[in-house]
Amino acid sequence: MAGHSKWANIKRQKARVDAKKGKTFTQLSRAIIVAARNGLPDPAANLQLRTAIEKAKAAGIPNDNIERAIAKGAGTYGNDENNLEEIRYEGYGPGGVAILIEALTDNRNRTAADLRAAFSKNGGNLGETGCVSWMFDQKGVVILEGKVEEEVLLDASVEGGADTYEIFDSDEEQGAEVFTEVSNLETLNQTLQEKGLPVKEAELRWIPNNSIEVTDPEQGRSLLKLMDALESLDDVQNVTANFDMADELIALTIA
């Protein structure tokens, strides 16, 4: 698939280098609240909720906090979180790289101000709605972690209705990402699990149609600093961008 998200790959590498926790407890709890609010509060029947819970557990969020977040989303634990909105913001990074941000917020003005500050401090600009979203398509992605036999993955992908897949097989990383249409994500996820493949999680992801090649180390460093700054904001759930960068340059910028 053209334009697999390079930022998703870089985040995996950065996690190995600096061992930072990814999302904050606030970000992960909000994802659970909204998933429970948008669908059934039962993770067995709600893939979005199940994925949010799995990410929260992986980050060490206590079960009591997870249950409370589910109850808030279901409307059985007070009404403080009912004002959370899902909003998409768009902008440009250094070198004209298009950046798409998904946020959950109870205060649009605060979120916009925080995003604008992050962009301006790191050589970018927060844009108007629609300025870059046309450059991306949303896909379902099933993430596998561990040794993957390509023949098994190919058969399961065909049976599960996948569009394509990408295998990672190196000393540092083994696994794969399998891509499909949004409406088929649950089916693909179940099929891969039934075939015994090491499914870690499933998610929706914005995939760029085309990518800008970043070759300048300073530009690359500024861009990754901006992406980190955006990801670190409590209101931000996901960030993606339409750039590509050689692995050698990535190693220099995240070392």
Swiss-Prot record:
Species this protein is from: Gloeothece citriformis (strain PCC 7424)
Record key words, sorted: Cytoplasm, DNA-binding, Transcription, Transcription regulation
GO annotation, biological process: regulation of DNA-templated transcription
Gene Ontology cellular component annotations, sorted alphabetically: cytosol
Main location (coarse class): cytoplasm
Subcellular location per the Swiss-Prot or TrEMBL entry: Cytoplasm
Cited Pfam families: TACO1_YebC_N, Transcrip_reg
Name of this protein: Probable transcriptional regulatory protein PCC7424_2775
Cross-referenced InterPro entries: Integrase-like_N, TACO1_YebC-like_2nd/3rd_dom, TACO1_YebC_N, Transcrip_reg_TACO1-like, Transcrip_reg_TACO1-like_dom3, YebC-like
Family, as annotated: Belongs to the TACO1 family.
GO molecular function: DNA binding
